[in-house]
């Protein structure tokens, strides 16, 4: 079986409309949303990555505001979900197998050392040498 990359590839996946712990459910629901809103149609720019990055920055700002302003956790969680939906949509727009890339990246970061910086601990291959 080939991996699903495009919106149309995901539309045939049966999915639940309730949390079930499934990557397939999340991706197929986001693909259904992209299809419904016609994001890939010419002139809609819904798959234009410049536009999508701008939306991501906007949503990240909303998450930041919810946290820094001490809003209820439910509001921050909703903004976090907006970011996840956008990121999953980015993989559709770019026709990237995000699940595969996630596992490749996790394999890589698990080999890195944690480093403590001025603001806190992080895991990176960056070196200030």
Label each PLM-derived region with a short phrase.
Residues 1-80, 84-129:
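Flexible "arm" and connector segments at domain edges
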């Amino acid at each position: 079986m080939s991996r699903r990359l495009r919106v149309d590839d995901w539309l045939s996946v049966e999915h639940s409309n309730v949390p079930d712990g499934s990557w397939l459910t999340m991706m197929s629901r986001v693909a259904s949303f992209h299809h419904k809103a016609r994001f890939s149609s010419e002139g809609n720019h819904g798959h234009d990555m410049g536009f999508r990055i701008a939306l991501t920055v906007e949503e990240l700002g909303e998450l930041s505001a919810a946290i820094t302003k001490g809003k209820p956790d439910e509001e921050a969680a909703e903004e976090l979900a907006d970011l996840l939906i956008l990121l999953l949509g980015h993989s559709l727009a770019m026709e990237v197998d995000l699940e595969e890339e996630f596992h490749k990246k996790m394999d890589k970061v698990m080999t890195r050392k944690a480093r403590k910086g001025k603001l806190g601990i992080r895991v990176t291959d960056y070196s200030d040498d």
